[in-house]
From Swiss-Prot:
Cofactor: Mn(2+)
UniProt-annotated catalytic positions: E65 (nucleophile), D66 (nucleophile)
Name of protein: Guanosine-3',5'-bis(diphosphate) 3'-pyrophosphohydrolase MESH1
SMART domains named in the record: HDc (SM00471)
Catalytic activity: guanosine 3',5'-bis(diphosphate) + H2O = GDP + diphosphate + H(+)
Top-level EC class as recorded in UniProt: hydrolase
GO MF term (any one): metal ion binding
Coiled coil: none
């Protein structure tokens, strides 16, 4: 096994362990690990990304935000570069939800190229998931508001990966959102 493959599998295993008790909010209660795996797959299979640190960060992007993982732990196991990317894409859960959403829009243009890639793939995965199956308790209006907010975040990520941006644009247009 190549060392890059081993590093990516280590990140996948770490994320699976950290997210093992978590489920997505869809009616099927999909295992949460499907999300970071899907984000990494979008980057590699659709975005053409081969950068090991970006793929590791995609797998780990929700570990600090949604589990007891620390940034120090990410750095210890995966290095400074992966830690930096994960740190850039992690919301501060001590802040109210609307403030976190506002900060995502505000910070998007200032993220590193690597963090922007993870953010693009994360948004694409989440929007596809919303189209596939509405989370329990979500109205059509809430889905539309999420699409609108995501389109504002993506505006700040433009110029990062034309393939992923094009796929997002099609999703926004299908929802009647101008790009």
């Amino acid at each position: 096994m190549s060392s890059d493959a081993a590093l990516i599998l280590e990140a996948a295993n770490f994320a699976a362990e950290k997210h093992k008790q978590q489920r997505r909010k869809d009616p099927e209660k999909t295992p949460y690990i499907n999300h970071p795996l899907g984000v990494a797959r979008i980057l590699s299979h659709e975005g053409g990304i081969t950068d090991t640190a970006v793929l590791q960060a995609a797998l780990l992007h929700d570990t600090v935000e949604d589990t007891n993982t620390t940034f120090e732990e990410i750095e210890l196991h995966f290095g400074q570069d992966v830690r930096n990317i994960v740190e850039e894409v992690t919301d501060d859960k001590t802040l109210p939800k609307m403030e976190r959403k506002r900060l995502q829009m505000e910070h998007a243009p200032h993220c590193s190229q690597k963090a922007k890639l993870v953010k693009l793939a994360d948004k694409l995965y989440n929007l596809r998931d919303l189209k596939r199956c509405t989370p329990e308790g979500w109205s059509e209006q809430r889905v539309q508001e999420y699409f609108q907010w995501a389109s504002e975040v993506v505006k700040g990520l433009r110029g990062t990966n034309s393939i992923l941006e094009g796929k997002l644009d099609h999703m926004f247009m299908d929802q009647g959102i101008a790009v």
